[in-house]
């Protein structure tokens, strides 16, 4: 049996007396599309921060691609193939759109053993990524010139520029119109079809349902459901805790 790409066992995190994560177990297979949902304060962001190395868990383990991530800093985890996009995009404001994509290629991809992208390679990959997300006509623009949905696309493209095995997309659609949400969902599915495993954190249920092959639900730091979307949304505990029914 193939080992999971991401394997979390007994993960626990406290902030003083507050239990943010309580014994979380989660396995994500290579190529999966997983939706991570739950009410505000349920532990989603804390879990992602522990996976990515922004926070240190007090108990349990995180393994990625067969390797323990214990003791690795966030940038070291990125070098191993973990990438994250943020709800509030964080581009380099003084760099062009294309320049923002070059940074992870130079400092992340080229930092991996045995990898060296030439300037021509980087230019070609930038152009390909910009076409993929529909920003090829914005390559020389600064981030301040972009619309809200274009900023979200740039944020996703920056994450992809690091050539991850796993992308964690955090609230990539908040505040967008329905048409823009559909556009982002289509992009994420396209990324997945190109071989990237994706965990999507999102409150827009129609987006989560159309994207996810599997749903994981957190409430009060505990995993209360994990399964296919059609089964999870009918779980009485999920309805009470998350959907308010």
Residues of each region from the PLM?
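Glycine-rich phosphate-binding loops of nucleotide-dependent enzymes
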Residues: 2-245
